[in-house]
Amino acid sequence: VKIVLNTSPIIFLSKVNSLKLLADCIDDIYAPKAVIQELHEYTLPAFIKVRPLSATGEAYVQGALGRLHQGELEAIVLAQEIAVDYVVLDDLLARLKAQRLGLDVMGTLGLLLFLEKRSVLNAEQAWQKIQQLTEQHSMYLSPQLLQQIKIQLLGNIFNTDTQH
C-alpha cells in the first residue's frame, strides 16, 4: 500500500501515538513539502518520504490556491504524480476535490480502521484512539458516524435499546 499524507492526519495520529504504527502495515508513505512546512513543532518520522512536486504540479498548486490550503493541494497533486493507493485528507472540500480527480481518499479515521484491520491495533485500542481524538483533540465526527464505528469495532454489545 502506498499513501500520501496531508497535515491533519499526521497531527491527529501523532496526538494518539499512532503515526509510527503506519510503518508496520503501509509500504510507502509520502508527504509533500508544504505539509512538512505546516507541521511546525511535529517531527516527521524517517519512514515518511518527503517528495517535491513536478514543475507542472507546482504551477497547478499556485494557480489553484484559494478554498484549499497549499498542503492539501500539494498532497492531491503528489498523489496524482506518484500514483498512490490513497491520499489521506480530513478536510471535506479537499476530499471532494481529490475524488473528482479520480483519487481514492482516506482520512485519519480510515487509517485507524486500517490499522485495526491489519491487526496492528486491536478493536478496543482503535476505538480508544478514536474517542481520544474526538473528546480531547478536537476531531469532529457526527454522533451517527461514531455509533457506526463503535458497532463496527466493538459489536452491538453497547446498544442499550431494547425492543418490546
Q: How should each PLM-predicted stretch be described?
A:
Residues 1-86, 92, 99-103, 144, ...:
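Active-site-proximal, substrate-binding regions of enzyme catalytic domains
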Residues 78, 111, 129-132:
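A general alpha-helix detector
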Residues 95-96, 114-115, 132:
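Short secondary-structure capping/turn micro-motifs that flank functional sites
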Residues 96-97, 123:
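Short active-site-adjacent structural elements
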Residues 103-104, 121:
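A generic short alpha-helical patch detector that favors 3-5-residue windows
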Residues 109-120:
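Short alpha-helix plus adjacent loop in nuclease-associated cores
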Residues 118-164:
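Long, charged alpha-helical interface segments
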